[in-house]
Amino acid sequence: MASSRSVVLRVLVAVAVVAAAGAPRLAVADSPPLQDICVADLRAATAVDGFPCKPTASVVSDDFFCDAIVQAPSTSNPFGVNSTRATVSAFPGLNTLGLSITRTDLAPGGLNPPHSHPRASELVLVLSGEVMVGFTTAANRLFSKVVREKELFVVPRGLQHFQLNVGAGNASFVAMFDSQSPGLVTPTFALFATQPAMPMEVLAKTFLMGEDEVGAIKSKFAGF
């Protein structure tokens, strides 16, 4: 009887191993493309996994080219930062490829405020200047580093992170994402610049402030 149970146990273990080996893996980025090219038809409605493909006969070489990040955007704003995004909307050839890129410029002391990308990890390549890049984990631990020209820093998917110009002059970097639509969530705006407005009581209790103090903060984000 013991021998019989041992055989059954070995069979069950073998079945479990085979099943685990053949089980589908959880996707950690955009779904892989099912054809060589699928240039976005920007006139069509967006689908869950990207834009529909434009007819192959209508595809041209320029669909796979983009110069959106060549020029430095103006950084004349309270944060001293501006970004130019080369996502699928501006770069149709990215459709279904699971890629996008952003150029960000920072004035001296400029800050790209804490934010997250819920659908992508981010690889930062500094083009010029000195940029402190940092992210926080779910355990409230901060990882940060001053990144200089041609150096890289990676931010894991979905984590809050920031970029601060700590150099004497302007700074610029590109951020590469493993999604054609990484998404952007900035907590400051998500709390103080929502439409309709976040209830005052929620903000006052969250930040242990009086409503007059919350109102003063909200007034700074009017128009964002």
Swiss-Prot record:
Binding residue positions for Mn(2+): 115, 117, 122, 161
Record has Glycoprotein as a keyword: yes
Sorted UniProt keywords: Apoplast, Disulfide bond, Glycoprotein, Manganese, Metal-binding, Secreted, Signal
Coiled-coil regions listed in the entry: none
InterPro entries: Cupin_1, Germin, Germin_Mn-BS, RmlC-like_jellyroll, RmlC_Cupin_sf
Gene Ontology molecular function terms on file: manganese ion binding
Domain of life according to the entry: Eukaryota
Disulfide bond annotation, renumbered to this chain: 38-53
SUPFAM superfamilies linked: RmlC-like cupins
Domain annotation Cupin type-1: ranges: 67-215
Glycosites: 82, 170
Keyword Zinc-finger applies: no
Signal peptide: 1-29
GO CC field: apoplast
Localization (cell): Secreted, Extracellular space, Apoplast
Function: May play a role in plant defense. Probably has no oxalate oxidase activity even if the active site is conserved.
Subunit structure: Oligomer (believed to be a pentamer but probably hexamer).
Family: Belongs to the germin family.
The protein's name: Germin-like protein 1-2
The species this protein was found in: Oryza sativa subsp. japonica (Rice)
